[in-house]
Amino acid sequence: MIHPICFPMHRSRVISFYEKTDLRVPAKLFAHPVIKPDVSNIPYPLPSALETYHCAALGEDGVVWLGSSTTGLTRYAPNEPRKADVIQYFSAERDLVDNHVRALLADGHNVWVETENGVSFIEMRLMSMEEKAAMLTKETLIGIDRHGMISHRALMRDNDITSRVPYGHCDNDGGFTAEFAIGEMMRYDVMAREKGPDSPEAQDAKRVALRAFEAALLLMYISGRGDGFVARSYITTSEILPDDGLFYRKEGDYAVCVETRASKRKNMVGKKIDASTPVPDRLAELYRSEGFSDSDIIYKGDTSSDEITAHFAAMYFAHKILGPDDPELDDLIQRATRSTMQHIVEHGFELW
């Protein structure tokens, strides 16, 4: 008999940044005496050089916060049940404004941290794995999603996911998006089984899974070549053209190789490739709904074998989980599977 794994509640870091002049910052932080801690009796390796620890604060349950003058903050929690949580490291730009810690003020399980250029409040929030997953999924959809693809995105302001830059293609767009979609499909499968397919939890998971999977599947059709060629990623004409590979701009029934260092090196600038096979409307809606047409698409050339592995894994799970109730999607999956495998075989088991 299969038994589910039950994860206990766990403290996770939630970070807030403040200016030193912000009235929400406790005045005690700046008036707190700075006393160099004795770390010689801590029976574990510490992430910063011992001589750089120059301030400390005592929290609840035996927790000791240790500030380094050069390399951030350490949390020593000898009573944590998980060994991995006994020593934790906090640094800029994720947790601190910078790594030059000046003063600490414990606040229950949490801590205020003054560094050279600002203040951080580190909340060690007790949450379930489900709560943490929901928080991370929300941040992913707000801060990383690009035309449905999930890989990475730069920020203009540290820790502010609303400041994401409006571009950011990645060679892993296909693979990472496919893998993200698999996770959301499994979430949908569990929620549908436990709470019903029409429950808000199941419908939310299905919505996220479909968008991500369709974005990954689109890369198997977007070139318009109709021969199973899989693109690595794509951008629109509103995005910055990277100079790190072969890119093709779609123009009517053709796609033209644009100028990059790679295309010049290979003497491929201006080369025309067939693009007459229509992109399925359902998948093209990912960019058309944002106001872009087929002629606004610039796709990146052939992808790699690890991306293909992720694509096929996602198609398998989509066929099993989403396909039974979505024959249109299942047909797109089967067509992509056949054409991609045929392409690989015909090209000597390579992806070009």
Residue ranges of model-derived segments:
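Short coil-to-beta transitions that initiate beta-strands within beta-rich domains
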Residues: 4-34, 42-60, 91-106
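Conserved beta-propeller blade signature
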Residues: 63-66, 110-113
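WD40 beta-propeller blade core
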Residues: 74-75, 120
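Short loop/turn segments that connect beta-strands within beta-propeller blades
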Residues: 77-82, 125
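Beta-propeller fold detector
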Residues: 85-92, 130-135
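Well-ordered alpha-helical scaffold segments within catalytic/enzyme domains
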Residues: 125, 178-198, 295, 310-328
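Extended ligand-binding groove/face enriched in aromatic
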Residues: 154, 170, 204-352
